[in-house]
């Protein structure tokens, strides 16, 4: 069986747009008839996903797999680092947690994971025509180069040609690209087959003199100037933008608490796309105000974030709103916080054994355990105004929760899940709004409470919308890149089955 061709996208910095460029290439190659899979050897992210077989992987490669039209597979992201503090992360290898590690301890051992990386990559390469590889940060981090397993170090391992992207929207893109190239070794520079100017706004003709000078100084071609594309596609790099405080300019005001260790904020992207729902992320009582719904999202460190909630005054503010009838929703870690007690007998969350009082809004108690619960889930909401909504999601949590109240939903096997008390709702399900049914029922529920007519505000199905956005992304990138040069870098022609 022949091995797949590959192309790698590296960037001059974090946030250069590597993830979306890779998603675009996945879509383009799939449109051109190739079997495509994304790959990133090591991803650091708080947003993760559970595959069909219960393995945990980064959401960036999930999005890229969706763009390629294939099911997410943990082989696409064999190493996932989930930060739990400023100096440590949970290390997940092949979808399974290996435990917490400090940054220094991880750097000492990460090269031992090369066999896992190569096994995952080679397995994917045997099943596909093209592998689209995403780098991380910058290949010019000279203090990290010796043990690199995600940028040029990986490119050497799999013999990948590289496209280097710079973000012009932040300014200084010529210095970014030239400086990065100059800091690379000669054999690394030889791997770069083209430079990409990403996120450009304006008249490209103004750039022409700079592009010519950049090509002259680097001896590398600029293979595209990609415009700033306004597409609604989940992007790890958009975290800071999405978590920025924005006033609600839509009829309904939804306030999501910006927890210090917030995770899987992507759960709420479908809400942002609804014409009646204004979504804000807040981190103070002043910002909270009097919303129509308060949401406590997932978190990588429930105990620390509960302490922060208490110290910031947001706990008292949420309790006051709830007492006045404002609906409150908790997801995963946020659900645990809404309960009566949270016990960490082994120090899994806190580092040391402890028990904390929760907000007391739901009759539940949670005990954290070393084992992580990972599963894809189908359910039907059974609570009040949400009853009958079909849910498709996944669970990622360490802890067992005892529920002494009414369930939020019923799983496909008949098991009750989550909890409801009055206008307070909690669930472990991530992705609960993706099908659209719960979003519509939530919107009607909130509209009625506020005296707003919800008629005519329904959305197209989330999956249909997602596919439209992937096509828009691919169209924009295809028009901007010299795709003949990209295919030539891989030794392929644009039409499937042709080789150069």
Regions found by a protein language model. Name each.
Residues 335-336, 433:
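Short active-site segment of divalent metal-dependent hydrolases/proteases
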Residues 348-375:
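Conserved P-loop NTPase catalytic core
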Residues 339-347, 351:
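Extracellular/periplasmic helix-exit of transmembrane alpha-helices
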Residues 1-320, 327, 344-347, 370-371, ...:
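Flexible phosphate-sensing "switch/lid" loops adjacent to ATP/NTP-binding sites
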Residues 330, 334:
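Gly/Ala-rich beta-loop-alpha elbow adjacent to hydrolase catalytic centers
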